[in-house]
Amino acid sequence: VASLTAPQAERGEVVVDIDATLITAHSEKEDAAPTYKRGFGFHPLLAYLDHGPGGTGEALAGINRRGNANAGTAADHLAILDLIENQLTPAQREALVIRTDTAACSHAFLDELTTRELGYSVGFYARADVAAAIEALPATAWVPAVDAEEKVRDGAWVAELSHLLHLDSWPPGMRVIARKERPHPGAQLRLTDIDGHRITCFATNHPGPDLPALELRHRRRARVEDRIRAAKDTGLRNLPYKDAASNQVWIELVLLAQDLTAWTQTLALHGEHAVAEPKRLRLLLFGVAARLIRTGRRIILDLDKSWPHAPAIVQAITTLRAYPAPG
C-alpha cells in the first residue's frame, strides 16, 4: 500500500531497511541469552519499507533470534530477505533496494543480492585499506555532500574509492563510496578518524554518477530507527512468553499492528495525524471517548464533540468510505 505513494516510487525504487534491535528479558525464556551490550534477552532482525519523512513505513518481516546472535550472520539476513520478497509483487521485487548497516556486509549476503539482481546500499567497514585509499585521493575527488533537503551540507564531502580498492573477491558491479565530515563541536573523536574527519563508507551496486544522492539515500536508513521505536511502543518492548514459537507470533502481531497503523495513516489521515507515532495516536485518536448507537437499522458512532481531534476521525472515516470496494 504505502510503497505506491512513497517518494522512492517516483524513482522506480522500493527501498527496504533491515536492522536488528535488542529486547530485554527479565526472566528465563527460551532463546533468551546474554547480549553484546551485557544485557539479557533477544536480538530480533526486522525489515521495514522506507516511506520517507512524510509517511510511516510498513513492516515487512521480523525474525526472533537469541540474544547472543551474531549481528553479521548472513543466514539470518538471507532468511529475512526471503520473507521480504514474499511480501512484494513481482514488479516491486524488480525495483527492490536493500539498505542496511555494516552487519550485513558479508560476501554471502551481497553475492545473493547480486544473484537475485537486487539493488543494495550496505554499510562498509572503513578498514586499513580504505583508510589508505582515502589518504590517496586527491582533493578534487571529493564533492560536497547534501543534507536531508538535498542542499549542500557544509563540512561534509563524498568520494568514490572503488578504483583504489581490491574488490575482486566481492560481487561484480559493487562500488564503495566514502563520506567524510568534520565532527560536530563537542563530539568525541575516534581512533578511526582520518585527518580530523569522521569517515563512513557504504557499498552499492547502483551505477549512477550522482554520489551525493547515493550517499543521502544510504544515510536515510536512519529512519528505520523510528520504525523500531514505534514497534516497541506497539508491544515489542517485551516478549511475554516462555517459549520461542509464541514469542515469534507476538512479533508478527506487533508488525501487523504497525501495518494497520501505517495503512490507516497512509489512506485516511492527514497532517500531523498522518505522521504521528503510536503514543501520540493513542492520545489524539485511539483513546477518544465515544459510544455506539443502534437505531433504525443503523449503527452510529457518537464521538465526544468537545475533543479537538474528533473531526480528524470523522474525516478519516469519510475518506475510507470514498474508496472503491476491493475486487
Enumerate the language-model features and the residues they cover.
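Electropositive, glycine- and tryptophan-enriched low-complexity nucleic-acid-binding patches
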Residues: 35-91
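Short amphipathic alpha-helical "interface-anchor" segments enriched in bulky aromatics
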Residues: 211-265
